[in-house]
Amino acid sequence: MTQPPRIAIIGAGISGLAAAHALRDAARITLFEASDYFGGHAHTATIELPRSARDATPIAHGVDTGFLVYNDRTYPNLIRLFADLGVETALSEMSFSVQAARDNGGRLEWSGNNLSTVFAQRRNLADPRFLGMLADLLRFNRLTTRIAQAGTEGELAQPLGEFLDAHRFGAAFRDWYFLPMMGCIWSCSTAQMLAFPVATMIRFCHNHGLIQIANRPQWRTVRGGSRHYVEKIVAGLDDKRLRTPVRRITRTDEGVLVATDAGTERFDHAILATHSDQSLALLGDTSPAEAAVLGAIRYQPNHAVLHTDAAVLPQRRSAWAAWNYQRAVASERESGRVCLHYLLNKLQPLPWEQPVIVSLNPVDEIQRSQVMAEYDYDHPVLDLAAIRAQAEVPALQGQRNTWFAGAWMGYGFHEDGLKAGLAAAEGLRAHLSPIDAMARSPA
């Protein structure tokens, strides 16, 4: 009897998991993961804290440190996947706050929850720069909504910094709203954000309801942590290998050779569901086109700290939000990496009264006694070179039995990674002969 084809999937983030799940009944899948857990940015940590100040009963519960939320409008594939897997979800929110040093000393704090939190600092009511920021915010929303509805954003390849200057948006708007908001979305530095193409920003923000006051999407989170969907996918795979870094991939006339520390195995096809630079490093025989595309995407390293030190949040509790941006006092630190504090109690249903926070690139020292874990993540930088490279990816797919998948092919989010994994699986499935498919199908 004909053996079903062997497919190697390198990387067990959302893209690799999606591809493996989609192909599990069509081929013999081997899923390789270098780290000690499956999921990539879908990473849940179990921590134990007392229920409250009045009830010291310790409760262990999962919290997410990477992928946290999705919405009901722009994540159609993820919604279908969760429904198919029977994943339980809960309501979440996308509230946003800013902490920044004022030019004349002191500290600015505001949050976009409601009018009261916008003016959490009553002095902002009489601050011309702050009021100018709000006026610019409304003008920015009107302008970008008009551009998006006209469908002309694709013509705007200019960097964001030039766009803001050309339309005379003030420094307060840029530093106290726009760059903080973009930093929360893409987890990259101010210098990198100002180099983003305008089209990318407008299209994403319009689709996600970020530049409109009404009719915004509803955000949700996985109840108990994203590991629940990861575990359901992994449970359906026969051959999955943790702590098994792939060292080299070589394409031959007979298939694809995958080398690990345990030896070299031959597969009929391979899906590289890793960051583009990692895929480039794994391939020992890249074509000029592969080298050009995979080498065009840059990544921003970000250090995440899971902790309970609420001192990093705005001083006024009324200004606390789900996403809390803190501007570095030294501009050179701000231009290097963005600082964000995710208040998990607002993002996920947690059983503790105590604030639980993930701080990305903290600018202030966190009390070591309150640190529970630390992680490092890399996020794609979607500059013009990256956008151009994305357009060339389809021409690479299937060449020498190799496929690529990753969130770097889109906006860098969970839906983008899922979409890329499903697309790679669909393309590969089309290359399988009917005999291959029959060999895997149950009798």
Give a label for each model feature:
Residues 2, 245-378:
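Mid-domain catalytic core of redox enzymes
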Residues 5-31:
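N-terminal Rossmann-like FAD-binding beta1-loop-alpha1 element of flavoenzymes
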Residues 15, 37, 277:
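Conserved Rossmann-like nucleotide-cofactor binding loop
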Residues 24-48:
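Glycine-rich FAD pyrophosphate-binding loop
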Residues 72-198, 203:
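Mobile amphipathic helical/loop "lid" adjacent to a hydrophobic cofactor/ligand pocket
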Residues 113, 118, 334-443:
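Conserved flavin/dinucleotide-binding core of flavoenzymes
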